[in-house]
Amino acid sequence: MSDIIKILIVDDNPAIADTLADILEVKGFTVHAAASGAEALQILKEAPVDILLTDVKMPGMNGLELYRETRKLYPRLITIFMTAYSADELIQQGMAEGVKTILDKPLDMNFLVRLLSAYRRTIAEAGKMAAE
């Protein structure tokens, strides 16, 4: 079992996804990026991850719909919403359905790295690090 956290970033803005991926990789995380919910589901089939970090407002499948789909397939996957619209109804619904962490954009990268690192113990204790 690896102690490296595997993260899937989903954002329809490639600049945001790529920047996040670059920063998190430098910090020691394994990162995949997707530009849509559909692409994220495909990546998850091929490369299991520990944490899903997804934008909420995206064309096609939004972050809440992606959360619902991933929860069916991977019920223990940790999901973090990131949004510029923290009062949005999708955010409120996500929280009601079990999303525990909502991050406002623009993201505080130091806080994000600390948060993701804090999940390392939770993931390891649950014995659910993604398969290598």
What is each residue range found by the language model?
Residues A47-L53:
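Active-site beta3 strand of CheY-like receiver
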Residues M58:
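Receiver (REC) domain active-site loop signature in two-component systems and cognate sites
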Residues A35-E39, N62-E65:
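Acidic catalytic/metal-coordinating carboxylates
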Residues E89, L107-S117:
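C-terminal output helix
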Residues D18-V26:
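Charged docking surfaces used in two-component/phosphorelay signaling
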Residues Q42, L64-R76:
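Short amphipathic alpha-helix used as the core "switch/output" element in two-component signaling
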Residues G28-A35, I43:
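Short hydrophobic/Thr-rich beta-strand motif most characteristic of the beta2 strand and flanking loop
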